[in-house]
Amino acid sequence: MPEGKIIKALSGFYYVLDESQESGKVVQCRARGIFRKNKITPLVGDYVVYQADNDKEGYLLEVKERTNELVRPPISNVDQAVLVFSAAEPTFSTSLLDRFLVLVEANHIEPIICITKMDLLKTDEERETIMAYADDYRQIGYEVHLTSTIEGDGIEKLTPHFHNKITVFAGQSGVGKSSLLNAMSPELALKTDDISSHLGRGKHTTRHVELIRTANGLIADTPGFSSLEFTGIEAEDLGLYFLDIRDRSGDCKFRGCLHVKEPGCAIKDAVEHDQIKEYRYQHYLEFLTEIKDRKPRY
């Protein structure tokens, strides 16, 4: 039986990109009743087995195991998230970036940090500040790209990361996500209004998610992580999603250390010696308080 990947779901139809051929054929499929009986809802991003009645229509037979699953937008098997933040207009926010990084790490998705609008930095001091932040995150182990769609800087180094992967874009509103996409793939120009209406405003104006074929990969046309709450993340697990904290937490004196007031805490020691940046630690404490103060849902 042929296999493929769902790239669009709309009105009970699932549009499957046939991956057994290089033709890029898309087959419109319905789901068998067995899916409803077993309470399985196929998602955009799912790898599926299907049966084709002809070249254009068929039925889904099987949904393969998912590596991850996002709720908003409903999409599965996301390989990476490009976290787009601007160097200026709006101001670069490490707090918001760290929040996105926690959410991405918790969903087992590879993050790529992309700082746009580098051309808007007017002074050497402004540029040095952004470069220092970029170095901080690189030292933690993150991929960081500095780009300017106006000057075309950095785009060519970013594009190869999309090859054969499902990618979502996320980040601040108004940071130029759609401009970045168009700089990478000029053929998307026709879709700019559509993409910017989703990505730019951070509001969902349509009821379906679609994966767009571009840069030899698939990119979601809807922003990832529209909810920025730490739902499902427990206080004792938060440190796992700060890589610089996770790598050192095994050196704490007490198992289960939350790195707040506990004696013999390797994290607080690392902060004092500038091995973990103070702002990262403060964000950890802020997020920890937010999680502890979270009202239980019944």
Swiss-Prot record:
Swiss-Prot/TrEMBL GO biological process terms: ribosomal small subunit biogenesis
Upper lineage: Bacteria, Bacillati, Bacillota, Bacilli, Bacillales
SUPFAM superfamilies to which the protein is assigned, alphabetical: Nucleic acid-binding proteins, P-loop containing nucleoside triphosphate hydrolases
Domain CP-type G: residue ranges: 67-228
Subunit structure and binding partners: Monomer. Associates with 30S ribosomal subunit, binds 16S rRNA.
Function of the molecule: One of several proteins that assist in the late maturation steps of the functional core of the 30S ribosomal subunit. Helps release RbfA from mature subunits. May play a role in the assembly of ribosomal proteins into the subunit. Circularly permuted GTPase that catalyzes slow GTP hydrolysis, GTPase activity is stimulated by the 30S ribosomal subunit.
Keyword Ribonucleoprotein: no
Protein name: Small ribosomal subunit biogenesis GTPase RsgA
EC number: 3.6.1.-
